[in-house]
Amino acid sequence: MLSSEALAKAVNTARQAIALAVNLDALALIKAEHLGDRSPLALARQALASLPKIDRAAVGKQVNTARSEVQRDYDERLATLQAERDAAVLVTERIDVTLPSTRQPTGARHPITILAEHIADTFIAMGWELVDGPEVETEQFNFDALNFPADHPARSEQDTFYIAPDGSRQLLRTHTSPVQVRTLLERELPVYVISIGRAFRTDEVDATHTPVFHQVEGLAVDRGLSMAHLRGTLDIFARAEFGPSTRTRIRPHFFPFTEPSAEVDVWFASKKDGADWVEWGGCGMVHPNVLRATGIDPDIYSGFAFGMGLERTLQFRNSIPNMRDMVEGDVRFSLPFGVGA
């Protein structure tokens, strides 16, 4: 047990050390030495149990008083050092609120979004309507009503994402053409609509393919429509996207849902390959079976339809060598197209 003189010496030593602490780290070490579990004051408190009961209260009071003095000095020094630290931080990390702020870099709208909106504006200006449909479709709308035969290869799991459970006849639409059927079932004739949305096929991602892509689909059904109306519409569309001098041509092709069917090309001058005919999309007159499937008499009404891939359009229009750039989400790809977020 410490004597009164030793106890006073321990207190003085601790108070002097606390007063000389220059920073919070030094003060923490001093606290451990003079107020910690192995400090002289802590050992003196532990020794109280060995004293006679008659002396324990008086000596215990002395020890508690001594510890309180040291603790008080410690608390005061701690507050002082914390205030000094905070003042130093305010000086070194001061922000001048009168200075202009640092401009934060902004993102950019994806060029596919920009292209889709431009296409929509083009057709809305012509009096067409913008329509939409579900991405999870049934075989009825995606294939059957569009005159796809039961053994058509597009129905296989090698080409189409089917939705579990097996036999549900639900799938991720492989094109935006199901919107045609839904529109004809839901609207009064005549119909002039476009649909812009995502489609899904089991393609590997490479320079010219991606399993999730965007299509624009146009449909017109009215009395007396012909291939001439289709050609005129395609010419207006092409000039809106590629410039006023753009030329188009159509080549015979086959699609289950149009007859006659054609592929449409545009005469386009790229920076890399020069001017040439470039395949753009598919088109044709709506097949009579598609009209019948929606309750329309093909002897009274006729229609035309066309469809283009937005990624394909953007790729050759802007000379983008790799379609992967469109799906990787790197804002540096979108910025050159010039429209901020």
UniProtKB/Swiss-Prot annotation:
Its EC number is 6.1.1.20. GO terms for cellular component: cytoplasm. Its cofactor is Mg(2+). It is an enzyme of class 6 (ligase). GO terms for molecular function: ATP binding; magnesium ion binding; phenylalanine-tRNA ligase activity; tRNA binding. Binds 2 magnesium ions per tetramer. Keywords: Aminoacyl-tRNA synthetase, ATP-binding, Cytoplasm, Ligase, Magnesium, Metal-binding, Nucleotide-binding, Protein biosynthesis. It is found in: Cytoplasm. Transmembrane segments: none annotated. The keyword Lipid metabolism does not apply. Tetramer of two alpha and two beta subunits. The keyword Thylakoid does not apply. Belongs to the class-II aminoacyl-tRNA synthetase family. Phe-tRNA synthetase alpha subunit type 1 subfamily. InterPro entries: aa-tRNA-synth_II (IPR006195), aa-tRNA-synth_II/BPL/LPL (IPR045864), Phe-tRNA-synth_IIc_asu (IPR004529), Phe-tRNA_ligase_II_N (IPR004188), Phe_tRNA_ligase_alpha1_bac (IPR022911), Phenylalanyl-tRNA_Synthase (IPR002319), tRNA-bd_arm (IPR010978). GO terms for biological process: phenylalanyl-tRNA aminoacylation. Mg(2+) binds at E259. This is Phenylalanine--tRNA ligase alpha subunit. It catalyses: tRNA(Phe) + L-phenylalanine + ATP = L-phenylalanyl-tRNA(Phe) + AMP + diphosphate + H(+).
